[in-house]
Amino acid sequence: MTEQKNKASLIEFPCAFPLKVMGAVHPEFEQAVLDTVRLHAPDTQAHHITTRPSSKGNYTGATVQVKVENQEQLDNIYRALTSHELVKVVL
């Protein structure tokens, strides 16, 4: 099997995918993450995101439940989030 086929077999689309996002402690972090995800998954609503401070309070963590239709859409969301100035890491 090729690497691409192996990756495709790990996730069955469409699905609800939990994105883990770490970023700056900033009053607009949650809205920035939500707005960025909505560019590629417009059905994502505010109740799909939860945030919490890191243990030392230096970062904010967010989990966003996103309905994704295919790998390309998921990749586009990852790229958009990782390029945002308030985002440090996306898992």
UniProtKB/Swiss-Prot annotation:
It comes from the Bacteria. Pfam families: DUF493. InterPro entries: UPF0250_YbeD-like, YbeD-like_sf. Belongs to the UPF0250 family. PANTHER family: UPF0250 PROTEIN YBED. This is UPF0250 protein NGK_1021.
